[in-house]
Amino acid sequence: MSQPLNSNPEVLLRKRRNADRTRLEKQELAKKRKEQEEKQKRSKKNRFVRAETIVATTLATEREKTRIRRVRDLENQKVKNDLSHIPSDRDFILRISEREAGSKATSESELQDVDEEDEEDDGLIREKIVYDGEPSLLFVIRVKGPTAVKIPAKAYKVLSLLRLVELNTGVFIKLTKDVYPLLKLVSPYIVIGQPSLASIRSLIQKRSRIMWQRPEDKEPKEIILNDNNIVEEKLGDEGVICIEDIIHEISTLGENFSKCTFFLLPFKLNREVSGFGAISRLNKLKMREQNKKTRQISNAATAPVIQVDIDSMISKLN
C-alpha cells in the first residue's frame, strides 16, 4: 500500500523553498545562456574578415550567379521554342555508380561516356542518357555547396520550394519535365538518385516526422510518425490508412504522392562523417576526394543532372 503524503508544515515549507530555489537557479542559467549567445553573436558580427576571404567569396558567388543565369536563359529559349542558337535542346542525366569488383567497362557506349582523364580506373561507371520526360521517383539530399559561395536568391528560393533549407535533409520528389530545370538550378547543393523500395521503407519507418496537434496542445508540434490512427485521420479520405500505404504511394508514384510527401516533414539524416579526431579527419579527406569524382560541378547551361547510387548513401546516413 502507498504511504500517505506527509502534510507536516515544515516539510511542505522545505519543499516549497527547494522548488523556489531550483526555479531561480534555472532562470539564472537561462539568463546566462542568453547573454552568452548574444555575446557570441556580437563577436561574430565584429569578427575581422581577411581581404582574400572577401575576394574568394565574391568571385565564387559571381561564378554561381553566372551559371544560374545561363541555365535560366537556356530554359527561357526552350519555352519560347527559339532553338536556333542553343547548344542542345535535350536534357541529359549522368548516372554515376560504383563498379563491381572484377568488372571492367569494355562496351563501346561506356567507353564513349568516360572521359580521357577518367579512363584511369577510379572504380566508377559513368552513363550519360537523354531524359525523355517520363516521371520517375527521386530522393534528393541537401548537401554543402561549393566552397565560399553565398547561395543566390533564385537557388535559395528553389531549395525552399523543395523544403531543403537545412543541410543533411532529404525529400522524395517526382522528376518531370517541369522539375528538371529546378534541379539544374540547385545541382551544386543537392545529391539525387533513384531509391529502392527497401530504402524508402527504411527511411519512412526510421526517420518519418510530421506536424501534429494534440487536443491539449495550443499549436502543432513535431512528432515521430509511428501511429496508423494519425495516418488514417489525416489521409483516410484519400484511401491511405497506414504507414505501409504511404510507402506504396511514394514507391509507385500514386495519385496521392504529393499529399503523402507533404504530409511528411523532410527527413533529417545523420552526417556522413562526424568528430574531430584523427580518424574522422582522414575519413573527411576520403569523402572530399570521393565527392570530387561524383559531384562534378559545371558552369555550362547544358550540363547534365548527376544521379548517384542513392541507396548506398541512404544506408550511410540513415
Swiss-Prot record:
Subcellular location(s) per record: Nucleus, Nucleolus
PROSITE patterns: RIBOSOMAL_L30 (PS00634)
Protein name: Ribosome biogenesis protein RLP7
Its biological purpose: Involved in the biogenesis of the 60S ribosomal subunit. May act as a specificity factor that binds precursor rRNAs and tethers the enzymes that carry out the early 5' to 3' exonucleolytic reactions that generate the mature rRNAs.
Skewed-composition ranges (Acidic residues): 110-121
Family per record: Belongs to the universal ribosomal protein uL30 family.
GO annotation, biological process: maturation of LSU-rRNA from tricistronic rRNA transcript (SSU-rRNA, 5.8S rRNA, LSU-rRNA)
Region (Disordered): 1-49, 101-121
Biased composition (Basic and acidic residues): 19-40
Chief localisation class: nucleus
Keywords for this protein: Nucleus, Ribosome biogenesis, RNA-binding
Top-rank lineage group of the source organism: Eukaryota
Keyword NAD attached: no
One Gene Ontology MF term: RNA binding
